[in-house]
Design a protein with these regions (language model features):
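A conditional alpha-helix N-cap/helix-loop micro-motif detector
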Residues: 12, 84, 119-120
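Short, solvent-exposed loop/turn segments at secondary-structure boundaries
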Residues: 113-118
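N-terminal, active-site-proximal structural segment of metallo-dependent hydrolase catalytic domains
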Residues: 1-47, 51, 57, 62
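Conserved small/polar residues in nucleotide/adenosyl-binding loops
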Residues: 123-125
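Structured beta-strand-rich core segments of catalytic domains in phosphoester-bond hydrolases
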Residues: 37, 42-111
Length: 125
């Protein structure tokens, strides 16, 4: 299996550049993106042969993750049960018969580790 993970720093911006060409070139079984910065349904991707699982932040234009899979997932989780972090759309977890695939976009610690506690809270769930 081929897995690809890419922090796109805004899906709408990268769609104007080369996202679809890169997506096709990797020919991945599972393709995960982080920092989509869009609401669910705001961007429609035509990815024949792929199932799409999106998780968006409540705050518009902030964080967000998505997973595109050839095989349909048995179950999809959009978060890990922590209301504060789940509201930021940082997790898409897909269950398959033999494994779980977890796409996580961890919070930035910022300069001088000002937000390290926020970042670690995701790890300690």
């Amino acid at each position: 299996m081929r897995f690809v993970s890419w922090n796109v720093n805004g899906i709408r911006a990268v769609l104007k550049k080369n996202f679809l060409e890169v997506f096709d070139a990797f020919d991945a079984d599972i393709f995960a993106i982080q920092e989509t910065k869009c609401q669910v349904g705001q961007v429609e991707l035509d990815l024949p042969g792929y199932h799409q699982y999106w998780s968006a932040a409540e705050k518009k234009g902030y964080s967000g993750t998505a997973v595109f899979t050839r095989e349909e997932s048995l179950r999809v989780l959009h978060g890990l049960g922590n209301e504060y972090l789940d509201a930021e759309g940082r997790i898409v977890a897909c269950e398959f018969p033999q494994f779980w695939f977890v796409n996580a976009y961890t919070p930035n610690s910022q300069m001088e580790l000002a937000r390290i506690d926020h970042r670690l809270s995701l790890i300690h769930i």
